[in-house]
Design a protein with these regions (language model features):
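Charged, low-hydrophobicity low-complexity segments
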Residues: 1-52, 274-276, 406-412
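Conserved RecA-like ASCE ATPase "motif II neighborhood" in helicase/translocase motors
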Residues: 265-271
Length: 412
């Protein structure tokens, strides 16, 4: 599926392609004091004396760490805060248990945008040594959240419509385009709606892994973004074949993962005489997974394609990590029939945007909380161990346009 291209002298995109945002009004001392006083009053009314309340600012939400005078009363603090009317007075209220305190998250009166430029320019991303670094946004203390997709190794993104799922995908893709050369990374984009990923067809000559197709360059570019279940089934099946072929190459080279294989290949270039080649990472991005898996009554071929899509995704999630193949799924239908037990087992890293109910939140995260989010990129990021509340980085349509045009203009 991979296109061999000459990337000698390839230049990664620069930060000048991304917008600089004018800093917005920050959280005022008066707002902080008002919210601290409200928390203190609720606890005092429940006969819990507070030693300290420490605000940790975030771009959209602030975490207020509550330290009761008697540490034995932490559980009572949580109950009081959960049963209080804070959720009626303030937006985005979520109560969390911390190591040394109880935290209460409250939305700021005025949200700050998190520009993609600012997170890509942060030392945590620029100095990252991980294989597939992703700067997804900022959390409390305005710390940039960077994770390694190679270790994820797959990612489920879910939530109600227009809450930030597409923005998260754009942030992930931008992070990877700013850190990996075409020889190191390929994408597969599956877009049943046919509108979310069309801008990425400009990456065809450099970053897209596609099935061989007859036709003009225009026809090839048009088919580079997969738009229906039948084509998705074919591409995902081809990825499974690629995965098995890669396992054969690793076995022949006597290694057990893609990083070791590529290091050995660099040292022993003559391996190409035995069928060996440098293996780029492959990231399959699948938008609105539910649209690809809905069974269509009376259409056997469509039902077969639906089943094939699901089976291939599970296989890739189960075995793809070692050979550098990773899957990102999104859905706006977080029901148990879509996010099945098999999906959850094989996608331990999950992002939830605002959901319409506590049930939907639990379907995604095995925990409530996503129903409390305030939308517009406010997310809960679960890495399989702990949960972080993050404001997603924003990369606008015009910025994506500039990035893809820049890459399209590079030498093949």
């Amino acid at each position: 599926m991979e296109k061999e291209i000459n990337t000698i002298g390839y230049q990664l995109p620069g930060l000048d392609l991304l917008d600089e945002y004018i800093p917005e009004s920050k959280l005022s001392d008066d707002e902080i004091d008002s919210k601290v006083e409200a928390i203190r009053n609720i606890l005092e009314s429940g006969k819990v004396h507070v030693k300290d309340i420490q605000p940790i600012l975030g771009p959209a939400v602030t975490l207020y760490k509550v330290f009761p005078e008697n540490s034995d009363k932490i559980s009572k603090v949580r109950l009081l805060l959960e049963d209080s009317a804070l959720g009626l007075r303030f937006k985005g209220v979520r109560v969390v248990t911390l190591e040394d305190s109880i935290g209460i998250e409250i939305a700021n009166d005025h949200r700050e945008t998190v520009p993609m430029r600012s997170v890509l320019n942060d030392d945590s991303f620029r100095n990252s040594k991980v294989e597939l670094p992703v700067a997804i946004g900022r959390t409390f203390g305005n710390a940039v959240k960077v994770f390694d997709l190679a270790k994820a190794p797959d990612l489920l993104i879910a939530g109600a419509t227009k809450q930030g799922k597409t923005e998260a995908i754009h942030a992930i893709v931008a992070s990877l385009l700013y850190s990996k050369r075409p020889s190191e990374l390929k994408f597969v984009f599956i877009d049943p709606k046919g509108c979310e990923f069309s801008v990425y067809k400009r990456l065809l000559k450099h970053y897209l892994a596609v099935l061989p197709a007859a036709g003009s360059e225009e026809e090839e570019a048009e088919s580079a973004i997969i738009k229906n279940a039948k084509d998705a089934a074919d591409v995902l099946d081809a990825l499974c074949v690629e995965m098995n072929d890669r396992y054969d190459l690793l076995a022949l080279a006597g290694v057990n993962n893609i990083k070791k294989y590529n290091e050995k290949y660099k040292e022993l270039k003559h391996l190409s005489n035995k069928g060996h080649k440098y293996l780029p990472y492959i990231v399959a991005v699948i938008d609105e997974y539910a649209d690809l898996t809905i069974t269509i009554s009376g259409a056997p071929e469509a039902r077969a394609a639906n089943r094939s899509v699901t089976n291939s995704i599970i296989r890739l999630a189960q075995k793809g990590r070692a050979v550098g193949i990773h899957v990102i799924l999104t859905t706006q239908r977080p029901s148990a029939s879509v996010i099945t037990r098999d999906i959850k087992m094989n996608f331990p890293m999950r992002i939830a945007f605002r959901t319409s109910s506590r049930v939907d939140s639990r379907t995604i995260l095995d925990s409530s909380g996503a129903e409390c989010l305030i939308g517009s990129g406010d997310m809960l990021f679960y890495d399989g161990v702990k949960m972080d509340r993050i404001q997603c980085a924003l990369v606008g349509t015009k910025e994506i346009d500039r990035i893809t045009k820049f890459i399209e203009s590079r030498n093949e």
